[in-house]
Amino acid sequence: MQVKYIKALSIKRIYAERIVSGAKTIELRKRPIGMELGDLVLLYETAPDSIIRGGFIADKTVSLPISKMWTQYNDVMGVEKEFYDSYFDDCEVAYGTLIYQSFCFRSLSLDQIHKLCPGFVPPQATINWRKNWHFQPEWSEVLSRGRGELIQEGRLHEQLNFFAYQ
């Protein structure tokens, strides 16, 4: 599997649930966090949950002035205006990654992640998945399917190179 296409993103449970349910189809941040079209983004739910149980295939990333981001995307943000304004206080630009597809996965607790992924530290924002870390077969399936659909749509041009995993 090409782990360069897998990221882990720290997120509060409520927003992870909204992403997986489809109520939130853009992930907002104060700065760019390196998600690219076709990446599989694993949602690491922060404490007290400390678990990965969902994710999404990243669509395009947009950056807009705070007011324009709200005007264009508020109906798919999954946040209220008061929270949005507070979160982006003192910022001029908002960054958002649109969500192409979202998924539920078999849960991995932080204890399980530590056992399966040597050196894993919960991300402050995002981290790239490492080659020596565990990955679940379903992650490979959704990554391959999502990227395949983006290729068919003519939006992505790089094919994945998978190798057999024992």
Residue ranges, per PLM feature:
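Contiguous surface segments at macromolecular interaction interfaces
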Residues: Q2-I6, I11-I33, L37, P48-R53, ...
